[in-house]
């Protein structure tokens, strides 16, 4: 009994499909036999709808209901669903705090609130910078309000990190964006702590700490997926250019060191009209100068300034500038631009292919749903039309039988003058013939119905009914049915019902086997978690 109740509680698509097939089959048999007068016009979804349930129940409490089978597919398993499948969560009386923290973090309202705070923090920093040097005492309440708002925003950011830790501490540190968010939040917390402690001064470190408050705007990178994709594309492009950048840095170093030696006379020249005499004074300045030449910024003015010193050879200086312009500014920069464009095109092509694949899959799913819905509509229309035609044919047959009975009764009345024994024998013969005809018609109707339903679909059956009249079809196939081999038999109703019942139980057994396998997998996962 418990197993039967458990089977009733479970909702299996395959078992429901078999049960729906059983109901449709026996409903058709009953209609062909004239035992039922109603067809399934409503589905389970319509019956469970509160707005229509009362109306359907008041209309006909004994009407049949058509099952609509729609499988449910889980596209992506969330962290909350994984957490709910854990053994200690299922066995505990109350849900853990990690489940609540994950629900808060996944809430769209909380995400939008964090994004709003990031933009609000940017506006507050802009206003604070404008009011930083102001000595007006009337603006002190505004400054205090901005300071309180900055502290409130910082506390909300810290609370967000604590919720992520509470949700899953190990997964938090595996995500690069979470680590980036943590570093930005902690760096923006340092100037607030310094101000709270009371450290004052104008040192460089304090100024850098104050600048760190601006880093809170970088939290937008961890909030928007589109910005993350752009950054990932840039990182991927830079990875593909690793060796090219290494080669470029080597040439930077070579030309910087060469410039220090080649233009040493220019650097030590006593002329007062030299504008760029410190550009090659040491290695750092030489590296900056090489980078300026790499960008083609006033390179000719620098060359003209070098030519003012007669100790520097014009040939070597010209070769130095032209060679670096050819290698760095023309060749290397063109290669870098070409590689960046190629990488972006490849990434764009991959994204387009992925989007096209998803669109094709979506169109295929929509096409499948349309085909399934069309088949359901066609089968429903064919079934209703066949029922209506069968009812019409049964009515015509009943009228013919009534006319036949009336004619026979009239014949009996006309022969009323016969003897009493002849009358009794004729009445008994007429009753026997009528009963045989009725039994024969009902048996032929059931056998032809079961055989035609098992051999062909409902659509073909409805088409064959539409082409021929029922009485004509029976009379044409009557000799063939009489000459049919006795071994070729159709299933009885009880055997057919038992067959569908066993198929339904088989689906429940398969589902139970599947769940046992899932429990074994979850047990192994719980052992690994411990």
UniProtKB/Swiss-Prot annotation:
GO terms for cellular component: CatSper complex; motile cilium; plasma membrane. Residues 442-458 have a biased composition (Low complexity). The CatSper calcium channel is indirectly activated by extracellular progesterone and prostaglandins following the sequence: progesterone > PGF1-alpha = PGE1 > PGA1 > PGE2 >> PGD2. The CatSper calcium channel is directly inhibited by endocannabinoid 2-arachidonoylglycerol (2AG). Indirect activation by progesterone takes place via the following mechanism: progesterone binds and activates the acylglycerol lipase ABHD2, which in turn mediates hydrolysis of 2AG inhibitor, relieving inhibition of the CatSper channel. Residues 429-440 have a biased composition (Basic and acidic residues). Residues 132-140, 201-203, 263-281, 295-314 are extracellular. It is linked to Deafness-infertility syndrome: Characterized by deafness and infertility and is caused by large contiguous gene deletions at 15q15.3 that removes both STRC and CATSPER2 genes. This is Cation channel sperm-associated protein 2. It comes from Homo sapiens. The lineage of its organism: Eukaryota, Metazoa, Chordata, Craniata, Vertebrata.
């Amino acid at each position: 009994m418990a197993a039967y109740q458990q089977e009733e509680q479970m909702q299996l698509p395959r078992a429901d499909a078999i049960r729906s097939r059983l109901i449709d089959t026996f409903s058709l048999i009953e209609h062909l036999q004239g035992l039922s007068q109603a067809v399934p016009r409503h589905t389970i979804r319509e019956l469970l709808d509160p707005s229509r349930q009362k109306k359907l129940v008041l209309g006909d409490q004994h009407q049949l209901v058509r099952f609509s089978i729609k499988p449910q597919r889980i596209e992506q398993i969330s962290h909350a669903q994984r957490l709910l499948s854990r053994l200690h969560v299922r066995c505990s009386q109350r849900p853990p705090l990690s489940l609540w923290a994950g629900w808060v973090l996944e809430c769209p309202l909380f995400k939008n609130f964090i994004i709003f705070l990031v933009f609000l923090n940017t506006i507050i920093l802009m206003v604070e910078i404008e009011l930083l040097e102001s000595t007006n005492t009337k603006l002190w309440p505004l400054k205090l309000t901005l300071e309180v708002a900055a502290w409130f925003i910082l506390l909300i950011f810290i609370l967000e990190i604590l919720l992520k830790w509470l949700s899953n501490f190990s997964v938090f540190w595996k995500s690069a964006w979470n680590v980036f968010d943590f570093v930005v939040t902690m760096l923006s917390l340092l100037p607030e702590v310094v101000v709270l402690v009371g450290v004052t001064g104008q040192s460089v470190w304090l100024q850098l700490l104050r600048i760190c408050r601006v880093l809170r705007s970088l939290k937008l990178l961890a909030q928007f997926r589109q910005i993350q994709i752009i950054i990932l594309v840039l990182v991927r492009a830079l990875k593909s250019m690793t060796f090219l950048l290494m080669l470029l840095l080597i040439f930077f170093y070579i030309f910087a060191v060469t410039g220090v030696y080649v233009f040493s006379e220019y650097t030590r020249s006593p002329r007062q009209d030299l504008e760029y005499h410190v550009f090659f004074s040491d290695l750092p300045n030489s590296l900056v100068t090489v980078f300026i030449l790499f960008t083609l910024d006033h390179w000719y003015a620098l060359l003209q300034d070098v030519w003012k010193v007669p100790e520097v050879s014009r040939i070597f200086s010209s070769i130095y500038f032209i060679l670096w312009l050819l290698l760095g500014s023309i060749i290397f920069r063109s290669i870098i631009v070409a590689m960046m464009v190629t990488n972006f095109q490849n990434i764009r092509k991959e994204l387009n292919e992925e989007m096209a694949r998803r669109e094709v899959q979506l169109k295929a799913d929509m096409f499948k749903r349309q085909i399934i819905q069309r088949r359901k509509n066609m089968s429903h229309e064919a079934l209703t039309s066949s029922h209506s035609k069968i009812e019409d044919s049964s009515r015509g047959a009943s009228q013919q039988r009534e006319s036949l009975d009336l004619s026979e009764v009239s014949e009996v009345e006309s022969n009323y003058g016969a003897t009493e024994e002849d009358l009794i024998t004729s009445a008994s013969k007429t009753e026997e013939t009528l009963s045989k005809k009725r039994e024969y018609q009902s048996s032929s109707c059931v056998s032809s119905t079961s055989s035609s339903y098992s051999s062909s679909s409902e659509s073909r059956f409805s088409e064959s009914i539409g082409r021929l009249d029922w009485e004509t079809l029976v009379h044409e196939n009557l000799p063939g049915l009489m000459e049919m081999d006795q071994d070729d038999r159709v299933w009885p109703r009880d055997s057919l019902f038992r067959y569908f019942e066993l198929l339904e139980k088989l689906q429940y057994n398969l589902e139970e086997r599947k769940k046992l396998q899932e429990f074994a997998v979850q047990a192994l996962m719980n052992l690994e978690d411990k």
